[in-house]
Amino acid sequence: MILSYSRNLYPQSTGEKIVMGIDWSPNSQKLGVLTADHSLYLFNDQGERQDKIGLRSTEVKSSNKDFIPLCGTFSPCSTLFVVGQSDKVAYIFRLGQLWTDKKSIVARIPMDDAVTAVSWPLSEATSELSPIIFGTASGNLYLYSFQSKSIQAFVSSACFASLASSKTTTADNQATPLSPMSSPIIKILPIPSMPQCFVAVAESGLAVYVDIKTQQLRAAARHSKAVTTACMIAQKTSHGRHYLVLADVMCKVTVYAVETSAALCVCNIKTPQNIPFTASTASPSGGGCIVANASGLHFLTLVNSQPVTVSYEASSSAVTVYQDSGKGFLPQITSIAWRPDVSVLTVGTSLGSVDNFTPTIGSYRYCGAEVVNSAPNRATINIPRFNGSKRFAAGSIDLHASMSSELRTVKAFPKHDFTSFVQNPSGYKSTNIYLLGIGDSSIVIYSLNDDTINEFRYNASLTDKFFFDVGACRTMVISNTLGEFTVCYLTTQSDPGCTFYKVDIYATMRGCVAPHASVISCYPIYEDAAGSLNRISKIRTVCLGEERTDVLVTDLMPPDMCDDFSDPIVVLFRTKTSRAVDWLFFGPSGNAVLLRDISGGVSILNITDYSITQLSTSVGNGVVQWADPFDVIVGQESPDAPLYVWYNPTDIEDAPEILQPPVPVDNESWSFSYVKSNPNNFSKITAGHVKNISVQAIMTTPSGRQTSVSLDTNLLLFNLLLDKHDILGACQLLSALQDNNARVTNRNLWQKLCSVALDSFNFIVASRCYAALGDLPLSITAREIHERVQNAKDGEAGMTHDRMNLYCQAQIALLNSDLDKYDGLMMSCGRIDEVLTLYKELNLYSRAEKICPESMINTLRTEAIQWLINSGQMTTAGMLLAQRGDVRGALDLLIQDRSYLSAFELAKRAMTSSADPSLAPIIELLIGKLEDSHHYSQAAVLCTLGSGRNHERALALFRKSHAFDEALELARQHLPHECLPIEREWAEWLFQTGQYDKATQHYLECMNQEMAVESAFRANNFKLVESLLMDIPAAETNAHLCFRLAEMKYISGDAAGAATWLLKADQPLLGLSAFICAGKFDEAIQFIRSNLPRQSYRELLVHEAKRIISLGSAPSNNPVQEKTKTLTSSGVFASSSGESSEKQNVQSFLNRMESLSHIRGVYSAIELLKLAGLYEDVADILQGNSMWDELYSFAKEHAASFSNYPDILRMVADAKRVKGDKKSCATILEELCMELYGLSGSSSGSSGGMGAATDGYTRLRTQASHLIQARRDVLLEASSMYCDLFMYLEAIRLCKRCGDMDALTDVCLLWVSSNANRSLLIQQLKQLNIIEPTLTKAADRGMWDVCTELSEYCPDPEAVRCDLFWRRGRKLEIEGRLKEAEEFYAKAGKHQEIVGMYLDTGKFEDAQQAAMEMTSNFERERAMRSIRESKARVLASEGKWREAEAEFIELGLVEDIISIYRSNQMWQDALRVAKEHGDSVLVENLSESYVKHDKLRSGLGTSASAFEPGAKADLGDGSGLAGRTKQHGSDVQTARSILEAGSSAGLRKMLMSAARSGSDVLFEVVLHRCAELASMVLNNDIQDSSIVEDIAIISPSIHNFEEIGSPHERVMSLAVAYLSKGVPLSVTTGTESKGTISLIISDVCNREQLLLVCRGVLSLAFVESEYVNRITKQETHGDGIFCRLRSILLSYRNMLLNTVRGTKAAETDKVNFIPGDQELSRCFEATHLIIQLAKLFIGAKTISSMRDIVLVSSSLVRYCDLLPVDRCFVVAGESCKQFVEISNGNSNAKVMEARTQYLNQCCVFLNKFIDLHEEISNHSRNLERIDISDLTGSGIPWTAQVPVNLYLSKSRADEVRAFILELTMDESTTTTQELPREPCPFGCGKPIWIGACSCINCRQVSPICAVTGCHVINPNTHMLPSSRACQICGCYARPAPWNSLITKSKNCPVCEEVGFPIGK
C-alpha cells in the first residue's frame, strides 16, 4: 500500500489546538475532529469544513474552560456524536441527517472520573436501542442507555484487575473510586461480527473481552508493559478472527489473538529511541493497521492467518508521507482514523492540523480502463469522458465492497460492450452493462444503464460463473461446476443502513446438468399484475435437470422470506424431451418457454397445461426469438430462407405463417437479426391506439444493409382485443381474416372467442363462432337464445338485471347441456312453463315430472308410457307400469321386449309379496322363456315360489346352471338322497374349472381322498396334502404322492420338508441333493449321516461336489442335462421299481432343483467338502480347477490334515512359476523347503519317520533319490529364484535356516558378482564366516577377480593366492589353453603339474622342457621318470606292446604292464611277463583271474540281451555285472534273470521283483521295457493289448493322458514317464500308496536302449494344429514330452561324466554334447532345438525374433533323419516366408541381405516339402525318387523315413504350392533354387550352407549353438570359442545371441541354470 498526500482539512496553528480525537461517521459522509481548544469541527466527505460546535464544561451554562475533550465517536446512524471530557462528563450532540439540520445537545452524562474512552456499536436494531460504552480514568466501565437516558456501572477497576490472575470473571456492575492501583481505560474496541461484545484495553497492558449479554469477562491479552495505543484487526470473512495490536512504552508492537489471548507475533519497527506510539487505527477492510508516533506512520499488514504473520511495510510507512506534503518538519501525530470505505486516512497532529491521505495498493488496466485499488476492498475504474453517473465524480466509477476485507477482481458483463464503452462513453449505446466487484465475502454490482449499485454477501469461488439479464432485466445467475446455480434480483430499493440497493437472493437450485445462461431462464412475478409496484413475489425459473433432456419449472423465493408454511423452492412440474436441449427462454408473458434441441429442433413448453409442442425440426439451426412483447415466435433457418412466424405457438393446430425474405442485393443474403416492436411494452398498448401497433422482423446483410418484414398485425391484435374485452371487434377480425383468406384461422381461435362471448352473454357472437366451428345446431340454438333473451328484455319490463343475468346463465347452461343448472336457474327466474314446454318437446318426461305441479304428474306419466311404447321402449314402459301396480301388464310388456331378467325380478317380488293365482299362466310362460334363454337359476327360483312348487324341476335347473350351493340347500330340505351326487358333481365341476382349493373340500365331502389330494396339489395347499398323506395308508401310489409333495415343497423353499418326503418316497439321495441345491450344507451332512450308509458317505459328497462344479461350467442353454444324465442312467436317484417314467420324474425334479439353485461352481463345492471335513478332496478340486492361490491358503490352514502337504506346495509353486509370479513361487518354495527340512529331521530320528516322509512327498522323489536330496533341490530352486529377483537377503536367510553351507555360498557368490560395491558385501561374508567356501566356489566358476578380493580376507592370503593360481591353471588346462595354464602353475609353484599337463596331452617335449626348468634335482628326476612312464603308456595304447613292455620293465613297473595286458585280454603276454619279471604270488593270482575270465565269458554268451548280444561296454571303472551281483548277494535276482522270467509273470510282477533287487536292477528292467515300447513305435507295431499294463501302472502320472489321440504318442508318453517320474510304490510294494520310486541313471544304463527311446520320441508325427496349439505350449511350460526327454539325456550325460570313460571322452571330444556318443548327441541336439523353437514361437514377432526362429527351424532340417521329414521342411520354409513378410520395406542393409538369403532358402525348403507331400500322398514306401541335388554338401541327411501321418492338411499344402507357384512366376522377385552359402568357417574356403555345422571338404565339425542351432566357429580365427557358454552343462553358443538371451531370461537354455554373458 502507498499513502499519498491528498489535502489539508485544517491548517496548523499555535496555541492549544492539538487534535485530541478524530472519527468518521459509519456512512462515510461526516468527519468529526476534537481539538484541545474545546471545539468539535465537522467536515463533509470531500474534506470541506461544515460546522464547528463549542464544547461545554460540567455545567452546561458555565464558562469554565478548564477541561479538554479526550475522546469522541459517531452513533451508528451517523446523526449523533458523543464526546468524553476530562472534567468527568460526557455530552451527546445531535447533528441531523443534513448539514442544515439544527445542532443540539441531546444528553449530558456525569461520570465519576475523566472519560478516557467511548464506543457506540450497533448492538441492537437501532442506534437508540444500542448502549454507549464509556471507560474512565479510574478503570471503570459504564453502559449508557440512550433510550431511557440512564447510566449504569458495568465493570469496576477491581473486577477488571482481577483478570490479571484469573481466566474469567463476571461483571460486578459496580464502580470503584480512583486509586493508585487504578489503570485508565485507553481504548474500547467493538467486535463487528459480535455486536454484543467488545474489548477494553487498560493502560496497564491488560485487555479484557467483555460480553454485554452474558456479562462474562475474560482476558484477551496480558501485556507486561504499559500500553500507549491499541487497535483491532477484524477479518471480514465469515470465519475471520480478531487480532489485538498493542503498542507499549518500549516502542514494541505485539499482536494477540482475541479468541485465545495468546501472543502471536512481535513486529520490529525501526524508529528513533524513546519515541512511543501515540495513535493507531485498524483498516476497515481487515487487512492491517497503522500505528503512529513522532517519526511518522507505520503500516502493518496481516500477511497470513495460518499461522498469523503481521509484517511491517517500510515502503508504505515511511516519514516521507509528510515530506511529500511539502512540510519541512514532522509534528507529533496525535490521532488517526480510517474512513469506513477505506478511501481516506485522516491524520491529526499536535499543531492542530488535519490532513487527508489517499491509500493506493496498486493499479492495472482492464478492458482499456485503469483500475486503481485505493484500498484492499475498493477499486476505482478511471474512464475519461465519462460523466453519466450521479453517484461518482466525472471520469471514474468507484466499486467499494464494504462487506469484504479484500476486493479480489473486477469484471464487466458483457466484456466486449464495456470495452467499446470505455473507448467512447458518450457515443456507445447498449442494452445493459454491469461492472462486478468480487470480494472475499461479498459482491458489489454497478449497472451503467440504471446508475445503481447493489451489494450482497456471497463467498464466490474461482470457478463460479456470473450471468446477467437471464430471462429478465436485472436478473443475475451465479453458477458453479457442481451443477448448482443461485438466482439474484438486483432491486432498486434502498437497503436500510446502507448506501447500496438491496439484492434479493433466491433459493439455490441443485442438480442442473449444465448451469449456464443458455439453459436457465427466469421470469419475475410481481405482487400486482401490472408490476407497477416493482415488488417481486417470486421468480419463475425454467432450467435443465440432471440430464439435458430433463426440463424443470420451479418458483423460487428468498429463503429468509419463507415461513413454516411456504417453501423457497416449489417445483411446478418436470418433463422429459425427446432430444437434448441446447437453450431455452421464457416468453414475454411468462406462459410459455421456447426450447431448442441440439439437432436444431424448436419446441414450445406451455406453462399452463405443462405440454410440449414441437414447432419445427430445423429452424433452430438459424435464428429464433420471441417478438417481444407478444407471445409470437419468429425464426429463420438460414440466410435467404423464408421467415416462419408462429402467432399462437402454444396451439398445436396453429400452422406458422411463412414470409419470404427480400430479393438478394449484390449477391448478399438476407439474414434475420431481431424483432422491432412499437410500442415495446405491453402495458403501453391501450385501446385508443391499437391500430398503430407495428411489429417488424429486421433483416440484415453482411455489409450492414437493413430492411424489415412486417408481421400480420391483425393476428397480433386478436389477443389484445380479447384482453380489452372488444368481443365484437375480435369476431370481426377473425371473420375478416377468414373471408379474405389472408390466413387460415384455426378452431382454437374461434373456440377461445366463443368462450369469451358466452361469458359476456353475447350469444350472437357465440352463434357466429359455432357456425365457424361447423356446429350448426348449436349455432341455431345460440341465435334462438339470443332472440329469447332479447324478447325477455323487451317483453317483460319487470325483469330485473339480476334475473336477466340468471336467465342468460341458464341459456348458457342449456348450450352446455347442463340441464340441472338450467332447471335451477330457470326456476329462479320464474319461467317454469318455458322449461316444461322445452322438456315435452325433447321428450324429457322424467325431468318434467320432477319440476311440474302435482296435478300434472299422472298426465305426464301417461304421456310418457305411451311415448315409450310408441318408440319401442317397452322395457322402460313396463317398469313404469310396475311402479303404478299393473304387474301383469308390466310382465307382458317385458316378455314381449325379451327383458326376461327384468321380468324375473318383477315376478319374484310379486310372488314373494302375495300369491296371486292370476299370475300363474304368465309365470309359467316366463319360466319357459328363462329356460330357453339359458337362465336356469332364475327359472329354478321361480319353480320354488308360489303354490305350484316343483322341487325336482328346480333341482335339475340348479344343477344345470352349476348353482350347486342352491341345489345342495334345496336337496337337504326336500331331496336328501341327492346330496352326495350333488357334492360329487360339484367337486368334479370345480376341478374341471380350475378351482382346486374348493374342489378339495367337496372331494372330501364325497369321500374321494385321492382326488382330494390331487386337488390340494394343484391348489398348492401343501399343508393339506401333508395332512391327507398322513391319513392315507401306505400303498404303491403313496411313494409317488410323497415324491410330488417333496417336489412342491422344494419349489416353495422348504428344502427340509422336501428331504423328509423324499426319504419317505425312497429317494434319500435326491433328498441330499435338495439340501445341497438349497445351500444348506450343514443339514445335508446331517441328513446323509442319519439316513445313508457310512461307507458311501465320502463318495456321495464328492459326487455332489462334482455335480455342483459341473453346474457352474455348464452352457447356458442346457446347464444340467449332460451333467446329471449319469446319475439317472446309473439308477442313483431311481426307486427300487426302476421304471423309466419314474426315472424321468426324478430327472425332471433334479433338473428343476439345479435350475432354481444358486449353488454352483467350484466355491460352493469347496464349501460343502470343507464342512464335511474332506480336506484332501477339496485340494483335489482346487488343483483340478487351477485355483492355486486358494489351494495354497487352504492347504496352509489345514496342513495337519494333509498327508501330501509338500506335494501341494510343489504344485502351487510350479503354477506360480508358469504364471510368471516368481516372488510368490520363491516364497512357497521356501515354505516347502522348511517343510521338507522338518521331514528330513524326523526321518533321521527313526525309520518310521522316513517312511512317512517318503509317502508325504511322492512327487519330489521323481527329481531326487531320497528326501534329503529333494530338500536340497528345492532349496537350490528357491534360492535361485530369490537371486533372480535380486532378493539376496531372503535367499541367505533361507540357506542359513536350512544350514546348507553350499547353497549359502552360491547365493553369496551371486550377490557379490551382481553388486559393484564388493567391499561392503565381503565384510558381510566375513561376518557369516563363509569367505573360504565362497572363494572355493568362485574359483570353480572362474570368478578370479572375486577370488582375488576374497583372498585378502583369508588368514593366509599368500597360500590362498597360490591355491587360486593352481586352480586357474587347472581350469585353463581343461580348456586346452596350455601356455596360459603353465604360467599360472608356475606362479603357484606347481611345476610338477606343468609336466603332468603336458603328459596328459602327449606333448613330451614341452614336458621335458618344463622338467629341466625345475630347480630341485629330486623333482626333476621324478618328472623325467613320469615322462618315460607316459611315453610307455602311449606306446601301449598305439599297440607297440614290446617297446612299451621294455620301457615299463626298465622303469620297474612290471605290474603296470601286466595290468595293461590283462585289460586288453592278452592273458598269455601277461603270464609271460609275470613269470619273467614277477614273483610267484603274482603269477598265481594272474592264473586264477584268467580261469575266472574264461568261465564268466562262457556264462554271458548264453544270456545276452536282445538289444546287445555282447557284454556291456566297459566304462573303465572295473565294476562288471558279475561283481555287482556278487556284492548284492546270491539271493538277489539280476536284471537279466528278471527279464527272462518276465514274459510269463507279467510286467507288474517283473517290476516288483526288480524293486526288491535294488535300484540298478529296477532301472535296467524299466529301461528295457521303455526300449520295447520305443521299438513298437519305430516298427509301427502297436497293439492295445501289449500296453494295457503300462497304462494301468504309469498313465495316472501323465497329465491329460486320455486326451492324447495318437497311439504312437501314447506309447512314448508311457516310456518317458517311466524314466522321468519313476515307478509307483503301489506297483512295487503291492499296497495302496501315492508315492513313487525314482529311477537314478547309473553306469548300468544301456546306451542302445536309451537311443531307441530317443529315436521313438523324435519320430512322433503331429498335425499342424496339434503341434502348434498343444505340443508347443507344453514344451514352453516345461511339462512336454521333449522337455522330459532332454532332462533324461542331461542326467545320462552327468552320469557319464562321473565315470572314467566319460572323463576321458570329454577331454578329447569337444564336439559332441554327450562325449564320445555322436548319435545320442544328435538326439539331444534335436530335442533341445524343438524346445527352443517352441519358446521362440510364443514371443512377439519382430525382425530379430523372426531371425532366431529361422535359424532354429533351419537347423532342425539337419535332423530330418530323426524327425518327421515333412514337418522339418515346411516349418523351416514357413519361418523364412514370415521373415520375408515382416522385413518387407526395411532399408537396413543386413536385413535386406538376410531377406534375400531366406527367400531363396524358403523356395528350396517349400519345394522340397511339396515333393515330399506328393510322395507321401501316393503312399510311397521310401523317398528315393525325390531329387536332392540342391541339398548336396549342405549336411542335410537324406536317410529319412516316411512319417506315419502328414503334418499339413491338403488345403494347407495347396496354399504352400500356390505360394511357390506365385513366387516362381513373379518377375519382380529374383529367387534361385539353391541354398544360401558362405565360406567355410574352418578356413578351407569351400562354400557351405549357412545353416551347416560341418564341412565336407575339410571334414571339420562344429558344436551347435545352444540358442540358434548354428555352428559356433569364429570365422575370423577359424577356431572354437575360448570357453563354453555355460560352465555347468558345458554347452556352446555364439556370443551375441547368448548374451541377448541371458539378458532377458538370466538362465542357460539347456540346463536352465544361472547363466553369465560371454565375451567375443
Curated annotation (Swiss-Prot):
Its chief place of residence is: other
For this protein, the record's Gene3D superfamilies field holds:
1.25.40.470, Tetratricopeptide repeat domain, YVTN repeat-like/Quinoprotein amine dehydrogenase
Q: Name one GO cellular component term.
A: axoneme
Q: Which organism is it from?
A: Giardia intestinalis (strain ATCC 50803 / WB clone C6)
Name its cellular compartments.
Cell projection, Cilium, Flagellum; Cytoplasm, Cytoskeleton, Flagellum axoneme; Cytoplasm, Cytoskeleton, Flagellum basal body
The alphabetized UniProt keywords are: Cell projection, Cilium, Cilium biogenesis/degradation, Cytoplasm, Cytoskeleton, Flagellum, Repeat, TPR repeat, WD repeat
Q: Where are the TPR repeats?
A: 1064-1098, 1362-1395, 1397-1428
Tree of life domain: Eukaryota
Q: What family is reported?
A: Belongs to the IFT172 family.
Q: Does the keyword Cytoplasm apply?
A: yes
The role this protein plays is:
Component of the intraflagellar transport complex B (IFT-B) involved in flagellar assembly.
What are the WD repeat spans here?
Answer: 63-103, 328-367
Protein name in the entry: Intraflagellar transport protein 172
* GO aspect biological process, one term: intraciliary transport
Q: Which InterPro entries match?
A: TPR-like_helical_dom_sf (IPR011990), WD40/YVTN_repeat-like_dom_sf (IPR015943), WD40_repeat_dom_sf (IPR036322)
